[in-house]
Design a protein with these regions (language model features):
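Pan-zinc metallopeptidase signature
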Residues: 23-83, 419-569
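Catalytic cores of extracellular degradative/oxidative enzymes
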Residues: 230-441, 461, 465
């Protein structure tokens, strides 16, 4: 059978070439000059008199010196002997199109379809005759290309011009479709020509075979069924296996059998919803304003393998997905199926907003926005909790690992400005602004890695958002890690990017954002999955969950996008209670208006935590700092949340008292009699607070307010705790010359150790605490609680990075300076000298690293060799404010003007002469 088919193919090809021997590109001009004399028009579609009244034999005799192929065309026209639907594709008008290779730069998009429109004519080893009736202007490009099946690119291009153009179709076992490229010269300037300034061009095409195509502007589903039924797939010379479905903005360039299997009866719904998807993306990116001069198409093609992707000229979808992404009924039954096409087309359109690391994230703006726009379900992606967790770890935005999570940053802007209708021109204007002032990925080195300044990438995006919105969005971008510093940080994103951002650059950018008067400190909380919201797809009821993972009820308790609309609603009825390092939000009767809660260091203004739930966590480094809790409100301002102690509700006051008692209990539970347990309080210093605790505890247990109200007990306890913590002689502090071991506060069997690779944490089974590399000494810098740290072998800690810490220097001049900070639970944590970063925390590899905020960052410190027993003598300098501010007598009272005698200076007993 195969041999017979091959033989038939060879014979037919030979016959075809022989038949075409009279007409080719070399003699086309001569033949055309003779042929068009018989017609009323230049494209030879209307025979003139008397030729139209002649018999076939008479006409052939008149045309005896013209190529037979042309004579056969004339006879067909005279007799109106067109096959069904043939004339529609043989004689057709074509609209001008813009060149995707030019407009990809104008619009900062990936290349749209490189094949604007099919002619519906196929061929295989045949000559095709193309009549062009008009002159082609210099600024216009007119050509044809041949495409095998549903290949994404054409090949063998031929320019065509006025007159007769003879084009040979290449071939093998499969025919080619002839595509037309009628490219006109338009641009984005105000003076540009419009598409309407260029005429439609009419072509008359003969030769080859009529395969046809579907056009939503011309055809209906009845025609679609007819097109599928009459397709001549069994003919060798017309064995074209593809089919095209033309929408207004999309072209399905598919395998005929695959699309017929999933859309056997109707195609208008499929191409219709894809058109709406592309129009929606265009509107969001502000591209629809150019529709009068830009009409490139998105191509969708199918194939075997490689699930879905976007590349130059087309988007691709695996055969098995077609049944789910083409018929609207199938898509609407599970709107998550919108995600794939919107995601891939989003790849084509994302360039303008594509921050480093976001190639698989920024395009999901279109996916989530389209799903929200359809109005049946909620959207996809992790919630505020993931952003919050990343913020607590100080992870820079490009390094945040959850791609769908990063997508929510873009979508939160959509929810606020578009869904909540704060400014529905926000994204179109943002895209337009960034098309003119583009994100800059930097230069590419010899290893193809890009060296990117975050100021020209993510921070340019953020600042442009503020500019377009005329709002201060700095806190939103802070929550997303935009201001975290990066020192040539390697980021993978379909290539290598080496990203840098200094603290000075970050703060300068933040300052520029904060110029805008209107604040948006609530934007980080906005969600569409906090509580049910009405459907907008014409069906009664509320939106259903996108899936169980992102279900309503799992994504937090505050921040539903609808609650942002009415800015007159103010927060009220909220209180907070603190227990150790956990802050819990409490609601009085009638509490309302909060969109989320934020925790600040009241002294520095630093944002410490935020949540769209009821819990906030005090970071280790701020455990002893003054705190401020606020509720974000719909107008972007914050409402200061009072403590439950300030509530008029007695039950809340009692709850606050119990929380305060728990704090006192924790504070006084770690004690020392010898001073070896660093950070612990001396038992002798706890007499007064223990007595007060006992009395207040009895009052709370018995609900007795006869002596003091609950508020008064709280105030007394807090006052006593503050007095205890400020008494320098009440707690055991680090001393020079003494030798210590450090045990991790979370990984309690792990001690800090130096090996040849740097600092690690290991167990006593791995290395005994008696070894010098596991014993540490602290040399004072002269500033209270600031130290150089070295092991007993004399090696200083002299370098610290995110992935490890070095302990290799023998010279104090190269050593790092660390500040020791004492926590209420008796542990100590270290920060860098400037206090900005937590240092010496144990990561998941048991490496002691720096500049991360993780839970294994506290240390229990114990003196194992006491060498500092002498009383020091110092010469007091009145002008030394650093010393003067740290002088106490032996009872713990601060001394402003000391005389000769023994005092506590910077935590040490000294004798002032």
């Amino acid at each position: 059978m195969k041999l017979r088919k091959l033989l038939l193919s060879v014979l037919m090809v030979a016959a075809s070439l022989a038949a075409n021997a009279q007409l080719n590109s070399s003699n086309a001009t001569t033949n055309y000059a003779k042929f068009k004399k018989f017609f009323n028009d230049d494209i030879c579609t209307e025979l003139a008199l008397p030729y139209s009244a002649m018999t076939d034999e008479q006409l052939r005799e008149q045309m005896s010196d013209i190529a037979k192929e042309l004579v056969d065309v004339a006879i067909k026209i005279k007799n109106d002997a067109w096959e069904k639907n043939e004339k529609e594709f043989r004689i057709a008008k074509f609209k001008p199109h813009t060149n995707p290779m030019i407009w990809e730069d104008y619009m900062n998009v990936y290349t749209y379809s490189l094949m604007p429109v099919p002619t519906g004519i196929t061929g295989n080893y045949e000559y095709v005759m193309i009549f062009v009736g008009d002159d082609v202007p210099e600024e216009v490009s007119l050509s044809v290309c041949k495409v095998v099946g549903n290949d994404g690119h054409g090949f063998s291009y031929n320019s065509i011009k006025k007159g007769l153009n003879v084009v040979q179709m290449p071939g093998d076992e499969e025919a080619r479709m002839l595509f037309l490229e009628y490219y006109v010269n338009t641009d984005t300037t105000a003076t540009s020509k419009k598409l309407a300034d260029y005429p439609e061009i009419t072509l008359h095409i003969e030769g080859g075979h009529v395969n046809g195509y579907f056009d939503i502007t011309k055809h209906d589903d009845a025609y679609w069924r007819e097109l599928l039924a009459t397709h001549k797939a069994d003919s060798v010379l017309s064995s074209y296996k593809g089919i095209q479905v033309m929408g207004e903005k999309v072209m399905f360039h598919m395998s005929r059998d695959k699309i017929a299997a999933v859309c056997p009866n109707t195609i208008t719904d499929a191409i219709g919803w894809w058109d709406e998807l592309v129009k929606f993306e265009h509107k969001l990116m502000g591209a629809d304003k150019y529709y009068d001069r830009w009409n490139d198409l998105i191509m969708a093609r199918n194939g075997e393998g490689s699930y879905m992707y976007a590349t130059q000229g087309y988007t691709y979808y695996e055969n098995s997905t077609l049944a789910e992404i083409l018929p609207w009924e199938a898509v609407y039954s599970s709107p998550g199926r919108i995600w794939g096409p919107a995601h891939e087309i989003g790849h084509v359109n994302q360039g303008t907003i594509n921050i480093v690391s976001c190639t698989e994230a920024s395009n999901n703006l279109f996916s989530n926005a389209m799903i929200h726009n359809v109005g049946k379900t909620t959207t996809r992606g992790v919630g505020v909790a993931t952003c919050r967790d990343d913020y607590s770890k100080k992870i820079a935005f490009p390094l945040r690992g959850d791609v769908i999570g990063k997508s929510r940053m873009f979508f939160q802007l959509y929810l606020y400005f578009h869904a909540a209708e704060k400014d529905t021109t926000f994204y179109p204007r943002l895209f337009e602004a960034l098309r003119h002032d583009r994100l800059n990925k930097g230069y590419q080195d010899s290893n193809w890695a890009y060296h990117t300044s975050a100021t020209e990438d993510q921070l340019k995006f953020a600042e442009k958002c503020c500019e377009i919105a005329q709002m201060d969005l700095s806190e939103f971008f802070e929550a997303w890690g935009f201001f975290e510093t990066m020192d040539e940080t390697v980021v993978g994103d379909y290539g290598t990017y080496i990203v840098s951002l200094s603290k000075e650059e970050a703060e300068a950018s933040r300052a520029r954002m904060q110029r805008y008067e209107k604040k948006a400190g609530h934007l980080m909380f906005i969600e569409d999955r906090i509580k049910p919201s009405p459907r907008t797809d014409g069906v009664a009821g509320n939106r259903i969950d996108f899936n169980d993972e992102y279900a309503i009820g799992k994504m937090g308790s505050f921040g539903q996008w609808g609650d942002y609309i009415d800015e007159s609603v103010k927060a009220q009825g909220y209180y907070y209670a603190r227990s150790l390092n956990t802050i819990t939000i409490k609601e009085a009767t009638g509490a309302k208006g909060a969109l989320g809660f934020k925790l600040y260091n009241a002294q520095t203004g630093e944002l410490l935590d935020f949540n769209n739930g009821y819990k906030l966590t005090v970071p280790v480094a701020h455990a002893n700092a003054p705190l401020k809790v606020v509720a974000a409100q719909a107008d972007g301002t914050d409402y200061t949340v009072p403590s439950v102690a300030d509530s008029d509700d007695e039950e809340m006051q009692l709850e606050s008292l119990n929380a305060t008692l728990a704090t006192v209990k924790n504070l006084t539970s770690k004690t020392t009699t010898t001073g070896k347990e660093i950070g612990h309080f001396y038992k002798s210093a706890l007499t007064e607070i223990n007595a007060l605790y006992k009395e207040a505890k009895a009052a709370a247990d018995n609900k007795d307010t006869s002596k003091h109200s609950y508020k008064e007990w709280i105030a007394l306890l807090e006052q006593e705790m503050e007095a205890l913590k400020s008494n320098p002689s009440a707690r055991a502090y680090l001393k020079e010359l003494d030798v210590y071991t450090l045990t991790n506060g979370q990984l309690r069997s792990y001690g800090m150790c130096y090996d040849k690779y740097g600092l690690i944490a290991n167990t006593t089974q791995q290395m005994a605490n008696t070894l010098p590399n596991k014993r540490w000494m602290f040399e004072s810098t002269g500033v209270a609680h600031h130290y150089y740290i070295k092991n007993k072998n004399g090696l200083y800690i002299n370098d610290m990075a995110d992935n490890g810490t070095s302990c290799s220097g023998e010279d104090q001049l190269t050593a790092w300076v660390f500040k020791a900070n004492y926590l209420d639970d008796g542990t100590v944590y270290f920060t860098t000298q400037d206090g900005l970063y937590l240092a010496m925390d144990v990561n998941s590899y048991n490496i002691v690293a720096g500049k991360e905020l993780v839970s294994a960052a506290t240390w229990g410190i114990r003196a194992v060799e006491l060498n500092n027993t002498a009383i020091e003598e110092v010469e007091f300098e009145a002008e030394n404010e650093e010393v003067k501010s740290e002088i106490y007598d032996l009872t713990g009272r601060k001394v402003e003007n000391p005389t000769k005698g023994m005092y506590i200076v910077n935590g040490k007993k000294v004798f002032i002469k």
